[in-house]
Amino acid sequence: MVEADHPGKLFIGGLNRETNEKMLKAVFGKHGPISEVLLIKDRTSKSRGFAFITFENPADAKNAAKDMNGTSLHGKAIKVEQAKKPSFQSGGRRRPPASSRNRSPSGSLRSARGSSGGTRGWLPSHEGHLDDGGYTPDLKMSYSRGLIPVKRGPSSRSGGPPPKKSAPSAVARSNSWMGSQGPMSQRRENYGVPPRRATISSWRNDRMSTRHDGYATNDGNHPSCQETRDYAPPSRGYAYRDNGHSNRDEHSSRGYRNHRSSRETRDYAPPSRGHAYRDYGHSRRDESYSRGYRNHRSSRETREYAPPSRGHGYRDYGHSRRHESYSRGYRNHPSSRETRDYAPPHRDYAYRDYGHSSWDEHSSRGYSYHDGYGEALGRDHSEHLSGSSYRDALQRYGTSHGAPPARGPRMSYGGSTCHAYSNTRDRYGRSWESYSSCGDFHYCDREHVCRKDQRNPPSLGRVLPDPREAYGSSSYVASIVDGGESRSEKGDSSRY
């Protein structure tokens, strides 16, 4: 039975609470055969005061409406009129009224009768008030009053339509909750874990790495005074050893720095007492600022290592390109102590370099950034052991100021094929010493008279040109000391 095709449905309102389906059928059955009597009940199965009666013949329904409208039934005046569908509904399926969006009238009808008939969705044809006190035949009002307590469960079981707006509202609430929680969860994911503070140790490890250039691409300006000073002066009795490439001043090879301060690139301060600094290999300490492009750096910016103390040897086993830093510096207005890489060593301070020691090799090998540790050691010692062009059986002896040291004997040992002990003075009258050897054992006593192994007899009578002279060194003095006599020779001062 299609509801749209069944116009014989009457709405009976204002019923007594005690009136039941049998009474209604007995009263209205006088006008014609009745196919369905539907008494609307609440949750407690009590009558809500209105019902729907469907006649088999629509003409009988019209006659019953005329006869029974306004009559009294069980002590109450009833209203009988043609039930019709709400104006907002269309088609065969009934939509729930707006006021009862969470409940289905069909479910309520089924709860009243136990079966759904053709009376679903029918509304009275006109509005009016009856004697039940506040009841209106407008089914928008009646449904809103009568169906709100009804559960949603019977609606879904009775085959009625699902709730129209309850689920979307729940979804909207869940979505709003998710929306409110989502950004919070995202904020928790993004900002929940505090960023780990870059500690000094981890920063130093990054700076010490040979594969990473540290802060090579950092364009920060105005760093602090001791920005790149990774290691403080070592404590007494502590020997620091480094297995890197030791390109100490390579940080300013592409620095493009202007107006540098007084002690900017002084990597090694005057050594402190009782320590030995050792560098084994290929560590590029200051390559971190190789592409820094930093201006106006502070006074002790790139002073990384406080050198060893008085009376102890500084040793470098590697490819130490000490002065590669000023190859591509493009620096303007350096201050008074800018290019002073090494402070004047104290007396009895022996600087030793067991390696390639190409001090001014910056013009030829300025771009060799990724030489491995094994490569540096293997290449350096292989070149010296095979008699390369840098130092061929070269042995020079000298002191810091042309005089033997006054303190106790300082024995220094090393092993290589060539020896060079030189005294270099910068333009400020300060000196630094380098002792480079490659192959066989030697030892130096307090007067710096060194004895070599007999595998490579020293040639004391001549002084071979040093690679620093070929590239331009900083006015060094190479002295050969035999007993107390010395002979000096000056190179050009084209470097500074």
Curated annotation (Swiss-Prot):
Which GO terms of the molecular function aspect are on file? identical protein binding; RNA binding
Extent of Basic and acidic residues compositional bias: 204-214, 242-253, 276-289, 313-326, 335-345, 484-496
One GO cellular component term of this record is: nucleoplasm
Give residue spans, biased composition: Low complexity: 97-114, 149-159
Supply the alphabetized keyword list.
Answer: mRNA processing, mRNA splicing, Nucleus, RNA-binding
Q: Where is the composition biased (Polar residues)?
A: 175-184
InterPro entries membership: Nucleotide-bd_a/b_plait_sf (IPR012677), RBD_domain_sf (IPR035979), RBM (IPR050441), RBM1CTR (IPR012604), RRM_dom (IPR000504)
Sorted alphabetically, the Gene Ontology BP terms of this entry are: mRNA processing; positive regulation of mRNA splicing, via spliceosome; RNA splicing
Function (record text): RNA-binding protein which may be involved in spermatogenesis. Required for sperm development, possibly by participating in pre-mRNA splicing in the testis.
Kindly provide the name given to this protein in its UniProt entry. RNA-binding motif protein, Y chromosome, family 1 member F/J
Species the sequence originates in: Homo sapiens
By which gene is this protein encoded?
RBMY1F
